[in-house]
Amino acid sequence: MEREGKSDPIPIDIILDILSRLSTNSIAKFGLASKFCGSILRGQDFIELFLITRPLSRPRLLFAVQNSDKWCLYSSPQSQFPDENHSLVVSADFHMELRRDMGQEIFGLVSGLLYFPNTRTGEVPVICNPSTGQYARLTQRSSMNNLSSLLGYDPIGKKYKVITPSSSHFDPENILTLGTGKVAWRSIRCLVDHYPESEGICINGVLYYMASNKFQFSGVKIASFNVRYETLKFLNADVDVTFCPALAKLINYKGKLCVLSCLWDNQIYPKPLRWKVLMLWLWVLEDAEKEEWLKREYTLPVNIVHGNVSVVGVTATGEIILSMDYTSESFFVYYFNPERNTLEKVEIQGFEGSEKNLSSRVYTFVDYAEDVKFI
């Protein structure tokens, strides 16, 4: 029997099936092996197959700890029913280390990717996949102005876009689409020049953020940018909603935009107690078309929340999650159920000693799940 000189190529569907069963770290290494491998893993067919073949896992909390010389990423289980009987101490799993020069701050976890805007340093923005460790530095814009940039995601077209809202007519390059093979800034026309005053939150393909422009409108407004159609509008909201962007955070509240402010108040209880309590104010955009807002106000139970904390998000069932801002000997995450008015404190162990004798900044993100998107 004569042996043929060439064997038949392996069908692409078999290759996809084999790759989908690898760990995320192995997938990341395979994607760097060649352009052919990378093109397979960037394809939507592989991404969808990966999600199908993986068992459904509960969402997790992702922690990005900013040490002096590196970023350290951890994750821990995200409690599903924090006001029921469960362990109040959970361990954080170490994921990976990232280079410190990737950025000074993180502007959100957007559909599985971390975004380092690098506005303060003037460096180009960086996008990173915390599941694989893969990252990409964006191309430099022709303008050298240190403009704030934001990352949005179009779930229909499955495209990420970076926008740099400008307050100058002399800075035309303001949008970058990723994953097209043509990494170049281009121009879209915004009817009103403005400057972002907050991080953004992308909900169902709409990127929301607070914006200002002292020359064209007073105060701060909420910008609404449709990532797919690249259209911009400003929402009508009471001045109470945007009175202080530094204290407010835009979050996804059960699929709706919510502006949440938290503030310590020691005037509620009379002397000599003067206990500090944490007040939460929520403005939920109940009807986006009519721009109708619903205000809610909560007082968290006394003497449970300690230290510098921030609201980091809301679970699918409506629990508001607060997290400490810096590492310490004991690090806590808090789950507040507004319907039951319950507050549970969960200790996170595993990264409290990531850098001895230093208090490191911690960025916490909710609903984290493994993702193999390649940039």
Curated annotation (Swiss-Prot):
Q: What is this protein called?
A: Putative F-box protein At5g52620
Q: Which InterPro entries match?
A: F-box-assoc_dom_typ3, F-box-assoc_interact_dom, F-box-like_dom_sf
Q: NCBIfam families recorded for this chain? A: F_box_assoc_1
Q: What is the lineage of its organism?
A: Eukaryota, Viridiplantae, Streptophyta, Embryophyta, Tracheophyta
Q: Which Pfam families match?
A: FBA_3
Q: Which PANTHER family match?
A: BNAA05G37150D PROTEIN-RELATED, F-BOX ASSOCIATED UBIQUITINATION EFFECTOR FAMILY PROTEIN
Q: Which residues form the F-box domain?
A: 5-52
